[in-house]
Regions:
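Surface loop/turn signatures of beta-propeller and other carbohydrate-active proteins
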Residues: 1-11, 20, 41-62, 102-122, ...
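Hydrophobic core segments of beta-strands in well-ordered, beta-rich domains
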Residues: 1-26, 31-34, 44-52, 60-64, ...
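Acidic, glycine-rich loop-and-beta core segments that form the ion-binding/anion-interacting portion
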Residues: 66, 76-78, 83-99
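Conserved Ser/Thr-centered positions that define the repeating blades of beta-propeller domains
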Residues: 35-39, 97
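Beta-rich accessory regions
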Residues: 90-192
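Short, solvent-exposed loop/turn segments at conserved positions within beta-propeller repeat blades
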Residues: 24-29, 84-91, 155-156
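Residues that flank catalytic or metal-binding motifs in active/ligand-binding sites
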Residues: 5, 29-32, 44, 59, ...
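A short local loop/turn or secondary-structure capping micro-motif enriched for an aromatic residue
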Residues: 26-28, 52-54, 80-82, 116, ...
Length: 194
């Protein structure tokens, strides 16, 4: 391949898998899957890709099983802008996965995590109670934040508020992390804004 980056580790069926974001020599995005039984020696076992090319590079791969549905999380680069979709220079979302990481695997249609700007490099973690939580980077490496007063003062980009992922009737749902409710207090009425 031309470009490989962003390793992510996944444990499944007693084996350790390493996912790598990649760009093929034909300028097509994919995720490479390597398998290990001892955590030191890995062998390439799969290349995850869509039936039709989807971008020229997939960064930041991750893998999560949400309510029984496996998802490949990725940040495809080079997706043409549409009226209400793909407004970021690079995208962040997931592909529903059918099949094992190391075998015959089919990826479903890409689902964007966010239609706003500046959401990238999402990562999941599993809470003690089994919920799958999603964090993203509020920033784009190639964006010019020079006109932002925060950036001029040395504050630039941040992590997003965590989200809970749910798979309901064949669709991805995202909700704010329920623990955030503890941060709420009595409402404050603000006068007329000008």
């Amino acid at each position: 391949t031309q470009h490989v980056r962003d390793p992510q580790w996944v444990q499944q069926n007693g084996k350790l898998y390493m996912l790598l974001g990649a760009r093929t020599q034909e300028d097509e995005g994919c995720a490479l899957v390597y398998e290990s039984e001892d955590g030191t020696r890995f062998r390439h076992v799969n290349t995850l890709r869509t039936e039709q090319p989807f971008g020229f590079m997939w960064e930041c791969p991750d893998y999560a099983v949400v309510d029984g549905q496996p998802l490949l999380i990725a940040c495809p680069q080079g997706i043409p802008h549409e009226t209400y979709r793909f407004a970021n220079p690079h995208q962040c979302g997931c592909f529903p996965v059918d099949g094992p990481l190391s075998g015959q695997t089919t990826l479903g249609d890409f689902i964007s995590f966010d239609y706003g700007f500046d959401y990238y490099a999402a990562r999941t973690l599993k809470a003690d109670d089994g919920r799958v939580l999603l964090f993203g980077w509020m920033g784009m490496s190639e964006a010019d934040y020079g006109c932002n007063p925060c950036a001029r003062n040395g504050w630039d980009q941040a992590l997003s508020l965590p989200r809970e992922l749910h798979w309901v009737n064949g669709a991805l749902r995202q909700t704010p992390l329920r623990e955030l409710q503890a941060l709420r207090s009595a409402p404050h009425k603000i006068g007329r804004a000008h």
